């Protein structure tokens, strides 16, 4: 970020949060629009819920050997990214609250460094989320259209290498973000990466579902076991499509905010949109909360494992859940 962008970004957070502490609807002096008051407790609550949910997802994948497949390894990577963005948003909210209430007094330069770290964590999480979604999409593509060769193409070692590569790349992006935080080109690269990755994912899914239509008759002609595997693969593709849709809806306002801040910071309508920055952070955290619910809604194996972890850890004798056919 350049200095003016960075200071406006930080001041917007501070002003919005300060308004939340004094009342629900406080007009920002630098904006003609009223800020939507969001209590600090909302950020903390969503952060805790997201953290617990995604820990549950990771625990379920580790616990259940039936979930030890490349797709669920990539889902685990996505859950880590969701945890990271929720934790960074929650910690940033706590820091702003402490600064506004004079419980924490530190130099402005150090505040900027802290803000850079939080922004870097958000940068890492969004890149990791996009890369994990792309990896899941490619996995589903291979599962559907190269079913017989799937286990030779997507091995556990190869999926582990992909995940390691994703997080190495994301960590590198985070380091670059901190080192060149004064440059608007960093933000421009992040925005470009988001829309390019989104275009790539949407194109892949359109291609996937168009090809899937031609496979419907083939699936009907397959033996029962093969047909069931193909339908399961298609269900997995639908699940990832839901994840992509939620990701787009929840993250798009944030990136539109960044785009407007670079392109028209003085425009009246742009200022109105940017005055609701905290709402866009809430949407990002909602994405982290909703992803585990989608896993549970779409996967019977996940639901069963969630029940075992939640209910049967301390009450193994009392809790017993019949298996569904």
UniProtKB/Swiss-Prot annotation:
Pfam families: 7tm_1. It is a multi-pass membrane protein. Residues 1-37, 98-114, 180-186, 266-273 are extracellular. GO terms for biological process: adenylate cyclase-activating G protein-coupled receptor signaling pathway; regulation of metabolic process. GO terms for molecular function: melanocortin receptor activity. Glycans are attached at residues 2, 15, 20, 28. It is found in: Cell membrane. The chain crosses the membrane at residues 38-61, 74-97, 115-138, 156-179, 187-211, 240-265, 274-297. The keyword Lipoprotein applies. This is Melanocortin receptor 5.
